[in-house]
């Protein structure tokens, strides 16, 4: 019997240190789950809590669905009524969760790299809990990135040589940062478009910024990003924002849709602002993978959670 190539990780907080073969193994495992493959049987209970300090519907529900499909026991956590509001640190909250018997915590937080304090412990610290990053500020969004990779691989069967345009508010997007890094590592060619005020020179190492209409006919993937209004506090460009003008200049309308390559796809991490990033009646079009991305998210998050279960030898897995 062929030995399965399964990933084992102590935490899943970033795609930065993932090896290419680990990415491919996670995609393969997620595809296995999607086809109805059996989950590994847990020999002891595993307790997980979802700590979302920023609003979320898709990611939160997707993680909980993945957890339940794996047979984990999900313990509710309400940030609005947590002791964080009394000044408790995230580390101390995690310490409490750990003491109560929680094995894993899935966290979304507004602070970039919040997880560093939870996984890089000082000599006197004893926290022993697995951390899965569901998004840190404008830093990383590893689970969205991984489900994006799964969706691209499912459609094209490979990454090498694919041309991918990331369009929109790139500076404030954690999805963009995770995706550009991993796509480049996997051999895809990355391009950027969108308002230059929301583009940073630090992205030049991954690809170049071009006018949208010049990019569209040669791209395999159009990855659209919403404008992150909630992260624009004090940004003078926010006051000048006009949804109609943005759609005219940077959105995918019917004319641009028709200019795309026959086999090209549109992706969006959601939520979609209709008639801003994408014409509303194109959300469920043949090229748009938005619904498939959400579907794939459950199975990829199952693969990611399972990798941490194995890495921490929880539930009898290793």
From Swiss-Prot:
Molecular function GO terms recorded: amino acid binding; aspartate carbamoyltransferase activity
Record-listed E.C. numbers: 2.1.3.2
Single Gene Ontology BP annotation: 'de novo' UMP biosynthetic process
Binding site for carbamoyl phosphate: 58-59, 108, 141, 144, 270-271
The keyword Transferase is assigned to this record: yes
Pfam families, alphabetized: OTCace, OTCace_N
Protein name, entry field: Aspartate carbamoyltransferase catalytic subunit
Record lineage: Bacteria, Bacillati, Bacillota, Bacilli, Lactobacillales
